[in-house]
Amino acid sequence: MQPEFKKKSIRSFVIRGGRMTEGQKNAFDKWWPHYGVSLFDGPINPAELFGRSAPLVLEIGFGMGDSLVDMAIADPDSDFIGIEVHPPGVGRLINRAGTEGVPNLRCYMADANDVLSDCIPDGSLDRLQLFFPDPWHKKKHNKRRIVQPEFVEKIRAKLKIGGHFHMATDWEAYAEHMMEVMTAAPGYENIAGGSEFAPQPSYRPTTKFERRGENLGHGVWDIIFSRSL
């Protein structure tokens, strides 16, 4: 399977190489019909998708998927949707979710901007998660950073009033950029107050990558804003 795209725009990601394992390939045959959602299916009805009404969490760029599966298992009273463009990560996520019988998780293999525009109803999300997005640290590539004024306004429309937009990054310059964009964005409030970074919430797992960075003295910054208007 290949990632789904619809609208032409500046991409905040690069489709990286990397072969799928046999287990990941088999996961698409076995588990995609249950866990996968197509961009081209159009707007979702979360209650129909999950068979119940529950708090809804959307994660953009779940990587290899372990932390998202962990969150879904740890919070069975909420429903989770993940978006990822890299097939090996999607294959790993659905393989683990299927093997472990995780009922409250679905995913897209598509461009997040397309999914937000075409599939996620306004005012439907209790939380949107964006953990460790590509920092595009070269200045000439800064425009590719996903956190931009237009993007955060799109997120605000998808959140419920009081819903949270939670970002995390291990690049200090990107953390400062995120804070600058969010502080200037209308209709948001920083739950930590002012321009303060938030402590890591208990629901966000610490990844192996993050622990490695911490052992090397790297920082991690959490930014959490709620929709106020």
From Swiss-Prot:
EC number assigned by the record: 2.1.1.33
Region Interaction with RNA, annotated ranges: 140-145
Residues involved in substrate binding: K138, D170, T207, K208, F209, E210
Active site residues per record: D134
Sequence positions that bind S-adenosyl-L-methionine: E59, E84, D111, D134
GO CC annotations on file: tRNA methyltransferase complex
Enzymatic class: transferase
Domain of life of the native organism: Bacteria
UniProt name for this protein: tRNA (guanine-N(7)-)-methyltransferase
